Amino acid sequence: MSKEDERFGKCAVAAEHLGIYPHEIIPPKSLVTLADDTAPLIRSFFNPAQEQTLFTPIPISVHVLWIMDCSCKIHLALEEMIDISRDNAVIGVLPKASSAQPPRGSFKKLGHPTLLPKGEAEARIAGEIYFDPEKDPSGKRLWCLTNESGRYGLRAGQSREHLEAICGIFEEFGLYFSMRYVKPTA
């Protein structure tokens, strides 16, 4: 087992029972890879005291999807919806309400597989980040990082330590999150 496998989990395809849907080869418009040059932009998104109040409600009302690919790069995007009947036009983002789903028909959500580099289907671990100021009473970690991805975060073998290691990577870039680990059922 490699050092990366021990730290972040093994690289594997999406959980078989969920698979990857045909529309999930389309990358989200909001897709960004965590790196030195993108970290300031990502930090500004997660700052609830933004100078531009026009955009303040957006981060606190949506889920941010994240995934670690096989080369240990972390990719993030809003959970976007597309209309496959309109040339895959982005029509919005899903609100963070757990019951929120795109309307039936030609509207589809872009899930975790869409965050991977083109042609890749394997990842180490994935989840969501959402605004939860009550999770950390100190008020320093207003956002919560989870492993809630049915295809990449809740597979057998995914551990709390893997999610803690992901938190550590974000912290290296000045991004501090509380954490909620969901134990895989398989």
Kindly give the residue locations of the regions a language model identified:
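Eukaryotic phosphoinositide-binding membrane-targeting regions
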Residues: 1-186
